Amino acid sequence: PCDVWSVGCIIFEYYMGFTLFQTHDNREHLAMMERILGPIPSRMIRKTRKQKYFYHGHLDWDENTSAGRYVRENCKPLRRYLSSEAEEHHRLFDLLEGMLEYEPTKRLALSEALKHPFFSVLQLQPAPKAWDSNRDISR
């Protein structure tokens, strides 16, 4: 499941041209995740070993700091990054939402992601033979 998350982040980067979570700070990373993907599920907050990042079941994050303002101004809900209203763009973001699901048990497996409607336009056909072994080339 974590590999699928990483692939989702990479696909987003290919689409937009920049990384989804541009930070090395753990707390800021969590704030970006909440801003882009919505609140972290309370069950996950209760089970984390990183309780220092949370207070009363919510991310302990001050939006009035320079980092807080940066996240507020530069991160937006995932679907707001759509650059087109075309159907294939909506299918891509549906795929990304499945790949970036917080809950690992609800996140798309790689095999499921590959069967997603976004990829349906890629009709898998047998590769053409590069070499026909019955052909006589001796002349």
Identify the function of each model-found stretch:
Residues 14-15:
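Hydrophobic anchor on a C-lobe helix of Hanks-type protein kinase catalytic domains
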Residues 18-25, 107:
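Activation segment of protein kinase catalytic domains
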Residues 30, 93-96, 110:
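Hydrophobic alpha-helical patch in the C-lobe of Hanks-type protein kinase catalytic domains
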Residues 98, 105-139:
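Regulatory extensions flanking the kinase catalytic core
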